[in-house]
């Protein structure tokens, strides 16, 4: 049983993470953080900026979008991992987040949303506004590798390509199986890009054709996305 890769020490070829003001840097990449939301305000990959404006986690109620700003509090730092926590609340709800960036550029956000009273939520979404020139190609969420569509109303299931089985979208044929799963996407160019994957409290995605967990209630939304 190998113990390689268990520690936070970067593997050979990578450099230690560095933190300067609100910027975290790893090999070839720098992520600027919005100190009020904890989300990236800029992502530079080998000299190529990817974002046109800061990433936003939006909660929409009948009264409109929530304006929740907190304070980013560092919680741990090593050569291979930097972590922070964030919290914001109002009279209706409490939103907390734990964020981690690792030496290979992987960033993980774990959100917890707790209502303080009965509340009608119309939408919860993550917006990643990318520069047009930085995002000519798209792949994932049920789409093959292609030019980035102007509009795409996707869900967790695709009519004619998947069948619903035990809360999981299963491809109907081998020719469409490589489009599955629909929980992640990549958008970018031959120079740089962003890969985004949705996870859950007990959901970490499929494992080839052997392990196909049900999508989590937190974002599955009965297949509607």
Roles of regions detected by a PLM:
Residues 2-225:
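Beta-strand/loop-rich accessory regions of lumenal/periplasmic or secreted enzymes
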